[in-house]
Amino acid sequence: MASPDWGYDDKNGPEQWSKLYPIANGNNQSPVDIKTSETKHDTSLKPISVSYNPATAKEIINVGHSFHVNFEDNDNRSVLKGGPFSDSYRLFQFHFHWGSTNEHGSEHTVDGVKYSAELHIAHWNSAKYSNLAEAASKADGLAVIGVLMKVGEANPKLQKVLDALQAIKTKGKRAPFTNFDPSTLLPSSLDFWTYPGSLTHPPLYESVTWIICKESISVSSEQLAQFRSLLSNVEGDNAVPMQHNNRPTQPLKGRTVRASF
């Protein structure tokens, strides 16, 4: 399998992405630092509503720079509504970002504070587009819920995901991952910040409406170590653990971050 043209090392990492993906220097890039004193409370924001059918969970895949849990997205059994959205957005995936130590790893930060990891639950606009490929590059095409993860107590709700990692140790491996509702990973409060942004790795499309939960969830040091023990190499090659896969924060460039609270 050819190595991708981007990654998280010095030679192909975030500082280099703009050479192949000029949008990396665009005006709506993610992640960002959320400066709470500069956010705007918006009374028009509705509560976030998620309805995920566990039967849509499909498989878990080691993609070399991370792992993805993918969902069947051929109908509206699993959707996100409310918040800033007038359309319904269909669940297709969740994944995580983490760092080489517990001191950093999240992509978004709050008042400069870095968290240990970040969960992304990704959806596409099924009201306007016919599939993910069509929606992925459109300004209103994607909606991603970001949940900051704070090191502390072990999070039992992560256990099914962590147990599945054994089967996908190396790049390209995939395994069935069924009967799972990712809303179980959300914090108890769904207060959120929202802003227009981008995918946080290539192709970096500026097509994401971000929903960042105000409340974090817990993850233990041991659980984070399990993320880092995944390998970015194909089976049989020298072991290269996935130490980190988080992009640094990008300038807001005049964007407003709205708060639901």
Swiss-Prot record:
Keywords: Acetylation, Cytoplasm, Lyase, Metal-binding, Zinc
EC number: 4.2.1.1, 4.2.1.69
Catalytic site positions: H65 (proton donor/acceptor)
Compartments (UniProt record): Cytoplasm
Amino acids binding substrate: T200, H201
Molecular functions (GO terms): carbonate dehydratase activity; cyanamide hydratase activity; zinc ion binding
Segments of this protein annotated with the region Disordered: 1-40, 241-261
Domain Alpha-carbonic anhydrase, chain residue ranges per copy: 4-261
Reactions performed catalytically: hydrogencarbonate + H(+) = CO2 + H2O; urea = cyanamide + H2O
Acetylation as UniProt keyword: yes
Family according to the record: Belongs to the alpha-carbonic anhydrase family.
Official protein name in the record: Carbonic anhydrase 1
Organism: Pan troglodytes
Lineage of origin: Eukaryota, Metazoa, Chordata, Craniata, Vertebrata
